[in-house]
Amino acid sequence: MPTLLLTGFEPFHTHPDNPSAQAAQELHGLELPGGWGVHSALLPVEPHAAGAALTRLLSEQDPGAVLLTGLAAGRPQVTLERVGVGVMDFQIPDNAGQTYRDQPIEPDAPAAYLATLPLRAILAAWREAEIPGDISNSAGLYVCNFVLYHALHWLREHGRGAVPCGFLHVPANAAVALAVPADRPPLPYLPQSEITRAVRVAAEAITAQSSVLQMGKM
């Protein structure tokens, strides 16, 4: 059975919850059309620990597709990231209390990698399912961008560059939105069930496209 590796992140910063973690946990073990199975895992919000965990997952699971997810509090809808860039630069401490400035992720590696997910097919599937979504041209320079770049680099370096791989940012859920202090601007949010549904539809679109490509090579 081919595997889609699905990751989410633990809660971080001031957020009491991470909707990407909930979606990943809810979809673990899901059987998708075409005989695909979902293997979910949670990543720590610390770049080096997340990179080590992701390397282990990629090596052990040997996935046929990779869908990384994380929270982008403030975005009103689900968004697919087009590119991962090879630098860390953030002032919000990670969960190890660290910040980084202009720090290369992989010295002497490409400055950026384009995601290899079927972005337009996912957008079309969302639209058919009445889920608003879009493509983003910046995953930021925090841990979300780190794991996107790390996964794409690892796959390329290990001869797996054709494996569909990319990142999906989800908006806040109600728990995250309700944790915002009353004197701060409110966050847009979606019910957790809708966030999970968007991740599931994306996974189905990825594996459907991959199955078609595999059949074309037979």
Swiss-Prot record:
Belongs to the peptidase C15 family. InterPro entries: Peptidase_C15, Peptidase_C15-like, Peptidase_C15-like_sf, PGP-I_bact-type, PGPEP1_Cys_AS, PGPEP1_Glu_AS. GO terms for biological process: proteolysis. This is Pyrrolidone-carboxylate peptidase. Its main location: cytoplasm. It comes from Deinococcus radiodurans (strain ATCC 13939 / DSM 20539 / JCM 16871 / CCUG 27074 / LMG 4051 / NBRC 15346 / NCIMB 9279 / VKM B-1422 / R1). The gene is pcp. It catalyses: Release of an N-terminal pyroglutamyl group from a polypeptide, the second amino acid generally not being Pro. Pfam families: Peptidase_C15. Keywords: Cytoplasm, Hydrolase, Protease, Thiol protease. It is found in: Cytoplasm. Its EC number is 3.4.19.3. Removes 5-oxoproline from various penultimate amino acid residues except L-proline. The keyword Cytoplasm applies. The active site is at E81, C144, H169. One of its GO terms (cellular component) is cytosol. GO terms for molecular function: pyroglutamyl-peptidase activity. Homotetramer.
